[in-house]
Amino acid sequence: MSIKLAAETLISLSIKERKELILYHASLIDCTNIIDEDLHIAYQYGKIISSIGSTYFEYQIQKDNQNYSVLELETQSNLISSKTEQFADEFIDWLRTDFKNKSSILEHHPNPRNLFELCGAKLLVTSNSVTRSLSTKMGQLWEEIADISPYVIVPEFEFGIKIKGIDIVLQTDSKIKFAQLKTLKGTLTGSQTNRAKKELGIHENPLFISAFNLGSWTFNDSKIPRIAGKEFWDMIHLEYELIENHIRKMLQRIDNEFAELAAK
């Protein structure tokens, strides 16, 4: 493949073509300095994005300025609302199916698997799986909301590639930063924290982000900065208050549906 790797080239390609070009050029990058072989591809991808990042972000920002900017508050609000409403719709569909399945288990399962099933406690049977599933699914929602900003690249959305341990790439202070984006400051357990340090540590300008400034930090590394809540959203020029308001409405809607299903 003789196509030159440049931001201008990638911009004109489809996501599939971008992925193919990045895969080829990434394979040419020496990664023998990275001890953990599981992170070789992530390191190569990171080097590729670092090389084209500034120009790619410049294109995104200029494109946004030429049109009615997504950073205008009304536009931001509409885009965030669209994503949270779609999330609520899809999660409520899953919730109804889950309740139906759990109800069937309680009514027809001759061999209960736990005390809650034995006692027919429908709400207790479903509550753990619901909150666990909700927390997991919301992880991608933060990426989708962040991706509204022209100062953010989500590699999976933009290039069709997954960089192990990296959720978003952002530009701030004229630097390209590679970040993990979690829901809360205490999202990671001890073993997960150690893995995150390795995954972030292979990149220049790593960053650990909590979407909301809630709880206590479980991630701590002197070489990897961490930010939370409004500080992060301000960094990518999105209005934190809008995000919090739309998330509140979304979760209240899901909570109301959960309560109605439990009452049946």
Describe each model-derived feature in a short phrase:
Residues 68-92, 179-204:
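Long, charge-rich low-complexity segments
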Residues 183-237:
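Catalytic cores of nucleic-acid endonucleases
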Residues 119-123, 206-210, 218-223, 247-254:
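Noncatalytic linker/hinge segments flanking ATPase motor cores
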Residues 136-199:
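Catalytic centers of nucleases
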Residues 102, 150, 240-241:
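Amphipathic alpha-helical interaction segments
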